[in-house]
Regions:
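Interfacial loop-to-transmembrane junctions
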Residues: 258-288
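Cytosolic, membrane-interface loops and tails of multi-pass inner-membrane proteins
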Residues: 4-22, 78-100, 191-219
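Membrane-embedded alpha-helical segments that form the functional core of polytopic membrane enzymes
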Residues: 39-81, 88-89, 114-117, 129-137, ...
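Intramembrane alpha-helical segments
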Residues: 99-169
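Multi-pass membrane catalytic core of lipid/isoprenoid biosynthesis enzymes
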Residues: 81, 85-127, 214-238
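Small-residue-rich segments of transmembrane alpha-helices in multi-pass membrane proteins
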Residues: 39-42, 93-94, 151-168, 216, ...
Length: 298
């Protein structure tokens, strides 16, 4: 009887701490990625305001971008949960690991964030709402088409558009170039990650470029995209009227990404794909948007 009682006691599953569950929910919203999107949205608003945007609209725009970006990131996490569960890199995420279950539990929160973000965007300006809505739709349908990462670029450009249109209601060439910068940046960033974990993606059954092509072919796209990214950043210097500070940093960052892409083209190894991925994240995107603001404040 004692042995049986002991067995019953030790066999009970350990209850999940509420704090672990809460951290899991926060993780689904991808706070690091969301913070980067909010930051570039903030910088876009600063540029639209000539360095000094109206504080009330800026604050409302930041709340809208935060809510919308968190909701969109949560939605992509939810839609990708099955693929994430088949990959070593992502299997420990909250949804595939079962930390938050059933997965549908997070949908009300995700939808509430998206609706709240879009509602605030509408209060700012109808064009800001349209930008947020297009970004949300692109995030949803991206998983169902070959143009996944092109639509991902559209979704990624939404915070920039919302931030700009919250301050300046007349979109022009600078906003177009900012959006194009993001749309070119997204495939560099995402595809380099996929190349770094190519075998993991293939084992998970991900049938899309670049992992479906031979490495020697797929890596050729990186110098081309990096050159386009570099060109867009310099075009933005002209269109937005930035000064020497932005010009200098845009050249340094653009060359860094381009040279890293050339190295990947030369070696074709996972390590160099990972370097392109890491360099293109906060070091490139964060710094080049920060340079725009500093240039206007100097």
């Amino acid at each position: 009887m004692k042995t049986e009682a002991l067995f019953e006691t030790t066999a009970k599953p350990v209850e999940m701490k509420r704090s672990d569950w809460l951290l899991g929910v926060i993780g689904i919203l991808k706070p690091r990625e969301t913070s980067l999107l909010v930051f570039i949205g903030f910088c876009s608003a600063v540029v639209a305001g000539g360095g000094h945007p109206e504080v009330g609209n800026l604050g409302l725009a930041l709340v809208a971008i935060t809510l919308g970006s968190a909701g969109a990131n949560g939605l992509t996490n939810y839609l990708d949960r099955r693929v994430d569960g088949r990959m070593q890199r992502t299997i420990r995420r909250a949804l595939p690991s079962g930390l938050v279950k059933p997965p549908e539990k997070v949908l009300p929160l995700i939808l509430a964030l998206l609706i709240a973000g879009l509602a605030l965007a509408w209060l700012l300006h109808p064009l800001a709402f349209v930008a947020g809505l297009v970004g949300t739709i692109a995030a949803v349908i991206a998983r169902k088409t070959w143009a996944t990462h092109i639509l991902g670029g559209v979704s990624g450009a939404a915070p920039v558009a919302v931030g700009w249109l919250a301050i300046d209601h007349s979109p022009g060439l600078p906003l177009l170039l900012l959006a194009l910068l993001i749309m070119v940046w997204v495939p560099i960033h995402v595809w380099s990650l996929m190349m770094a974990y190519r075998e993991d993606y293939l084992k998970a059954g991900v049938n899309m470029f670049p992992v479906t092509r031979p490495v020697s072919q797929s890596i050729k796209v990186f110098p081309v995209l990096s050159a386009a990214l570099y060109g867009l950043s310099i075009g933005l210097w002209q269109a937005a009227g930035f000064g020497w500070f932005y010009f200098a940093l845009a050249n340094v960052l653009g060359l860094a990404v381009f040279l890293a892409s050339l190295r990947l083209l030369k070696t074709g190894v996972n390590r160099d794909a990972w370097r392109v991925y890491k360099l293109s994240a906060y070091p490139y995107l964060g710094l080049i948007f920060l340079a725009m603001c500093i240039d206007l404040w100097l």
